[in-house]
Amino acid sequence: MDAKQSVAAAKPSLAKKTASASFRLRNGSLNAVRLRRVFDLFDRNGDGEITVDELAQALDALGLVADRDGLAATVSAYVPEGAAGLRFEDFDALHRALGDALFGSLDGAAAAGEPGGGGGDEEEEMREAFKVFDVDGDGFISASELQEVLKKLGLPEAGSLATVREMICNVDRNSDGRVDFGEFKSMMQGITVWGP
C-alpha cells in the first residue's frame, strides 16, 4: 500500500455508511438556509452550479473519501440536460433523495414514531465528525485546528484566530482552551433541529 492509499484508508468514507438520524434537520426553512450556504461553499467558482470536481474537492476538504465514479453517477442523475453541474434546485433534490435513502422519509419516520428513521451508531458518527476537526489526533480540537478546517472549507471565520478562539470558548465548558469529545458531542446535539 503506497502513502496515498494509506492516507485514503485512514479517512472516513462515504461508502456503505449509515448516517445518524440526529444530524438530519427537521425544520424546512432552516434547512433551506443552511443548504444554500453549503451550496455556495461548494460552488467554488461562483457560477451557480456545483460540478463533480467541486463536490469531490469539498468532500476531500472535509476529510471524506468518495468514489469518483460513484459520485459522478449519483450526481449526473440530478444534472439537467445541457448543464455542467448541479444548480441549487438540483442540489436540493439530491440532498432530499440522499436524506430519504439514509434516514427514511420524514413522513415515514414520524409515522413510525422514530425521530429520524434509519439506524446507525450515533456515537460512532459523532466520533468520525470529531476526527475531521481533531487534525493532530490528540483527542482535542484546538483553535488552530478549527481554523485549519475552516480555511479548507473556505469559510470567512478562518481569517481571524481571535474569532476562532471565541468559537472554541462558546463550546469549551471546562475552560481549557480546547474542545474535547464530550464538549463537541454536546455542541452537536445542541444544534440539532427537530421540527414539527
Curated annotation (Swiss-Prot):
UniProt GO molecular function: calcium ion binding
Annotated positions binding Ca(2+) 2: D134, D136, D138, E145
Alphabetic keyword roster: Calcium, Metal-binding, Repeat
Every EF-hand domain range: 30-65, 121-156, 159-194
Short name of any one Pfam family annotated for the protein: EF-hand_7
InterPro entries: EF-hand-dom_pair (IPR011992), EF_Hand_1_Ca_BS (IPR018247), EF_hand_dom (IPR002048), EF_hand_pair_protein_CML-like (IPR039647)
Residues that, per the record, bind Ca(2+) 1: D43, N45, D47, E49, E54
Xref: PANTHER family: EF-HAND CALCIUM-BINDING DOMAIN CONTAINING PROTEIN
Protein name as catalogued: Probable calcium-binding protein CML32
The species this protein was found in: Oryza sativa subsp. japonica
Encoding gene per record: CML32
